[in-house]
Amino acid sequence: MPQLDTSTWSITITSVVLTLFIMFQLKILKSSFPNNPEPKSTPMLKTSMPWEKKWTKIYLPLSLPQH
C-alpha cells in the first residue's frame, strides 16, 4: 500500500478555513441590520385601585411651634 502524503494538508485546511471566514465576513457585511431598535410604546391604561376611590386625609408633618 502506498503511503498517504499528508504534507500539504495543513496548508489546504488553513486556506479553506481562511476562505470560509472571508466569505462569511463579506456575506455578513452585505446584510443590513436596524441601527437602533426602539421598543414599541404601549399606551398605559390607568386602572383604578380601590383605595383611590376613597377620600383619605393627608396629614402634614408636625411643624415647630411659632413664637
Curated annotation (Swiss-Prot):
One Gene Ontology CC term in the entry: proton-transporting ATP synthase complex
Domain of life according to the entry: Eukaryota
GO molecular function: proton transmembrane transporter activity
A biological process from GO: proton motive force-driven ATP synthesis
Keyword vocabulary terms for this entry: Acetylation, ATP synthesis, CF(0), Hydrogen ion transport, Ion transport, Membrane, Mitochondrion, Transmembrane, Transmembrane helix, Transport
N6-succinyllysine carried by residues: 54
Pfam families: ATP-synt_8
Membrane topology: Single-pass membrane protein
Transmembrane feature ranges: 8-24
Function field: Subunit 8, of the mitochondrial membrane ATP synthase complex (F(1)F(0) ATP synthase or Complex V) that produces ATP from ADP in the presence of a proton gradient across the membrane which is generated by electron transport complexes of the respiratory chain. ATP synthase complex consist of a soluble F(1) head domain - the catalytic core - and a membrane F(1) domain - the membrane proton channel. These two domains are linked by a central stalk rotating inside the F(1) region and a stationary peripheral stalk.
Binding partners and assembly: Component of the ATP synthase complex composed at least of ATP5F1A/subunit alpha, ATP5F1B/subunit beta, ATP5MC1/subunit c (homooctomer), MT-ATP6/subunit a, MT-ATP8/subunit 8, ATP5ME/subunit e, ATP5MF/subunit f, ATP5MG/subunit g, ATP5MK/subunit k, ATP5MJ/subunit j, ATP5F1C/subunit gamma, ATP5F1D/subunit delta, ATP5F1E/subunit epsilon, ATP5PF/subunit F6, ATP5PB/subunit b, ATP5PD/subunit d, ATP5PO/subunit OSCP.
Protein name: ATP synthase F(0) complex subunit 8
Organism name: Ailurus fulgens (Himalayan red panda)
Encoding gene per record: MT-ATP8
